Structures are given as structure tokens and as C-alpha cells.
Amino acid sequence: METITYVFIFACIIALFFFAIFFREPPRITKK
């Protein structure tokens, strides 16, 4: 059961990284 927890944590970290990159790379979407 520990493997599932580790995978979940890893997935969360990757998702956070992807979100950060997506929000940081294209600043044209949030152009005010």
C-alpha cells in the first residue's frame, strides 16, 4: 500500500510542476 502513496505524491508533485510551467510559460493568456 505504500507504493500507491508514493505514486500519488509523485503524481501530485509532477502536476504542480506542470501547472507552474504552464502558468509561467504563456503569460499572454493573463494579459491585463
Curated annotation (Swiss-Prot):
Protein localization: Cellular thylakoid membrane
Membrane-topology descriptor: Single-pass membrane protein
Family annotation (InterPro entries): PSII_PsbT, PSII_PsbT_sf
GO biological process, one term: photosynthesis
GO CC, one annotated term: photosystem II reaction center
Keywords: Membrane, Photosynthesis, Photosystem II, Thylakoid, Transmembrane, Transmembrane helix
Lumenal side: 1-7
Entry coiled-coil feature ranges: none
Transmembrane region(s): 8-23
Keyword Chaperone: no
Record text on cofactor binding: PSII binds multiple chlorophylls, carotenoids and specific lipids.
Side Cytoplasmic, residues: 24-32
Function: Seems to play a role in the dimerization of photosystem II (PSII). PSII is a light-driven water plastoquinone oxidoreductase, using light energy to abstract electrons from H(2)O, generating a proton gradient subsequently used for ATP formation. Found at the monomer-monomer interface of the photosystem II (PS II) dimer, plays a role in assembly and dimerization of PSII. PSII is a light-driven water plastoquinone oxidoreductase, using light energy to abstract electrons from H(2)O, generating a proton gradient subsequently used for ATP formation.
Entry similarity comment: Belongs to the PsbT family.
Oligomer and partners: PSII is composed of 1 copy each of membrane proteins PsbA, PsbB, PsbC, PsbD, PsbE, PsbF, PsbH, PsbI, PsbJ, PsbK, PsbL, PsbM, PsbT, PsbX, PsbY, PsbZ, Psb30/Ycf12, peripheral proteins PsbO, CyanoQ (PsbQ), PsbU, PsbV and a large number of cofactors. It forms dimeric complexes.
Protein name, as recorded: Photosystem II reaction center protein T
